[in-house]
């Protein structure tokens, strides 16, 4: 079980006139797929970096299972937008790298790495050099590396942002498949409305200046996809389209319509 608890969290960078985050309250329960949606500059990455332990908040706190987050830890895996792979290593050694630093023996870490590569559909590419892979395949390696340590929580920092549209759709389906199989707790950030709607079991909408959580909504679309395996049908449903229109308006600062209030 893993519960992330964020209370009154704020971050003000040195020399900044406005806080990057202020008064953020959020609780993420075990097995949830929570997506933070917002425009650039609303503090999404700052919030994720606090959860990863890369930066310390200047106010409030973040806890995992009741323990304050103070620095990076193996219980929190991170997937970056830029793949952050080691080009001189092959695929399996990239995936096993974190296990090596944890003192896991070579045979066991390679066994775990192969199992994790199979989870993301790359078991046939274990010996390939990462620079020879496409962007989508490199990001699969990044996801496998984050999963190899069996973290309680997976933190994903706009991992599809650098991919072309078709590859991005494929990766979204892969990430949902991995979540469906592992039921890892996932915190995922994006500025794509459609991506947020498709992936999230719960969506939090962030607003800038300073960054705050403005809204939180439970969504059915991730589970609909896992039940049907038909992404096109999910994304073309009237309910999905209504939500997309609603969130686009909210990101542009427009008030709720009467129809949207009824949808809530």
UniProtKB/Swiss-Prot annotation:
Its EC number is 7.6.2.7. InterPro entries: AAA+_ATPase, ABC_transporter-like_ATP-bd, ABC_transporter-like_CS, ABC_transporter_ATP-bind, P-loop_NTPase. The keyword Nucleotide-binding applies. It comes from the Bacteria. ATP binds at residues 38-45. It catalyses: taurine(out) + ATP + H2O = taurine(in) + ADP + phosphate + H(+). Keywords: ATP-binding, Cell inner membrane, Cell membrane, Membrane, Nucleotide-binding, Translocase, Transport. It is found in: Cell inner membrane. GO terms for cellular component: plasma membrane. It is a peripheral membrane protein. GO terms for molecular function: ABC-type taurine transporter transporter activity; ATP binding; ATP hydrolysis activity. Residues 6-233 form the ABC transporter domain. Belongs to the ABC transporter superfamily. Taurine importer (TC 3.A.1.17.1) family. The complex is composed of two ATP-binding proteins (TauB), two transmembrane proteins (TauC) and a solute-binding protein (TauA). Part of the ABC transporter complex TauABC involved in taurine import. Responsible for energy coupling to the transport system. This is Taurine import ATP-binding protein TauB 3.
């Amino acid at each position: 079980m893993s519960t992330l608890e964020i209370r009154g969290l704020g971050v003000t960078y040195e020399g900044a006139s406005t806080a990057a985050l202020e008064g953020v309250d959020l609780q993420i329960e075990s097995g949830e797929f929570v997506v933070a949606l917002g425009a650039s500059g609303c503090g999404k990455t700052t919030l994720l970096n606090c959860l990863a332990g890369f930066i310390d908040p200047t106010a409030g706190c973040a806890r995992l299972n009741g323990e304050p987050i103070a620095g990076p830890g193996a219980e929190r895996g991170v997937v970056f937008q830029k793949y952050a792979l080691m080009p001189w290593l092959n695929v399996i050694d990239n995936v096993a790298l974190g296990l090596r630093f944890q003192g896991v023996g070579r045979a066991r870490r390679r066994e775990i790495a192969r199992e994790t590569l199979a989870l993301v559909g790359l078991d046939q590419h274990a010996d390939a050099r990462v620079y020879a892979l496409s962007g989508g395949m490199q990001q699969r390696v990044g996801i496998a590396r984050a999963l190899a340590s069996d973290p309680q929580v997976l933190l994903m920092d706009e991992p599809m942002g650098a991919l072309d549209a078709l590859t991005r759709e494929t990766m979204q389906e892969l990430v949902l498949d991995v979540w469906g199989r592992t039921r890892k707790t996932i915190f995922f950030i994006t500025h794509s409305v459609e991506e947020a709607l498709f992936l999230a079991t719960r969506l939090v909408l962030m607003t800038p200046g300073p960054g705050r959580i403005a809204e939180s909504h439970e969504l059915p679309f991730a589970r609909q996809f896992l039940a049907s395996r038909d992404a096109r049908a999910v994304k073309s449903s009237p309910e999905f389209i209504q939500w997309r229109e609603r969130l686009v308006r909210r990101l542009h600062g427009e008030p709720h319509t009467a129809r949207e209030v009824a949808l809530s």
